[in-house]
Amino acid sequence: MPDNPTGTLPEIILASASPRRRQILSEMGFVFSVCPSQAELYPDGSVAPAEFAVLNAQIKAKDIASKYSNGLIIAADTIVVDDFGILGKPSSKKVALNYLSRLGGKPHTVISSVCLLNAENGQIRSATCQSTLTMRPYTQAEAQRYVDSGLPMDKAGAYGIQDKEFNPAENIQGCYLNVVGLPACTLVRLINEMGFNPKLARNWKPEGDCTLCRIYRTEISRLR
């Protein structure tokens, strides 16, 4: 993290339709517009999961950057990885139930890649964040009710850590916001690396127990 990033943030464009990512950015104090990217890769096993997430985030950022002459594009891609491979967003309720059956009572990895692209000069930065999550041993009936609610259908791995009624997680190691879909610690680090000073909301408190999120929150407050 630079000792004193002084650049003023340009207009921020979020290349995602995710309501969770919008909420995280808003709570952090960022003002931004939303222009979701439809560009997306589908896993075929040809690259490692972390590399796949990076490529997907970069493709989304470049897709939206082509529509703007200036502005800072923020794109992200989140995947769930178990012993058998990548679990993206389920294509059907049957697939969602299969994902939940695979994950129940077991640990898995959540990887989020964040990509920032300055549309004015083409500067680009990417980084990934990984968390390990163990699901609680929910029953098949619980999983079916959750799937029938429709809540998991737009989420990687067919669950949302923030879905309190289903409450899927038993234990989380790493960044909570990474599991939600946008690790604040990774985002702030990338913004700093691009030379900008992110002025975070004074009342923002990162959810979860991520040490890096809390450190960045403290450091940014000190630099204001």
UniProtKB/Swiss-Prot annotation:
This enzyme's EC code(s): 3.6.1.9
Primary enzyme class: hydrolase
UniProt xrefs under Pfam families: Maf (PF02545)
One cellular component term from this protein's GO annotations in UniProt: cytoplasm
Name under which the protein is recorded: dTTP/UTP pyrophosphatase
Site (Important for substrate specificity): R20, T78, Q162
Gene3D superfamilies in alphabetical order: 3.90.950.10
Reactions the enzyme catalyzes: dTTP + H2O = dTMP + diphosphate + H(+); UTP + H2O = UMP + diphosphate + H(+)
Subcellular localization, as worded in the UniProt entry: Cytoplasm
Taxonomy, superkingdom: Bacteria
InterPro entries: ITPase-like_fam, Maf-like
CDD domains membership: Maf (cd00555)
Cofactor: a divalent metal cation
Protein family: Belongs to the Maf family. YhdE subfamily.
Cited PANTHER family: BIFUNCTIONAL DTTP/UTP PYROPHOSPHATASE/METHYLTRANSFERASE PROTEIN-RELATED, BIFUNCTIONAL DTTP_UTP PYROPHOSPHATASE_METHYLTRANSFERASE PROTEIN-RELATED
Function description: Nucleoside triphosphate pyrophosphatase that hydrolyzes dTTP and UTP. May have a dual role in cell division arrest and in preventing the incorporation of modified nucleotides into cellular nucleic acids.
Catalytic residues, chain numbering: D77
Native source organism of the sequence: Dehalococcoides mccartyi (strain CBDB1)
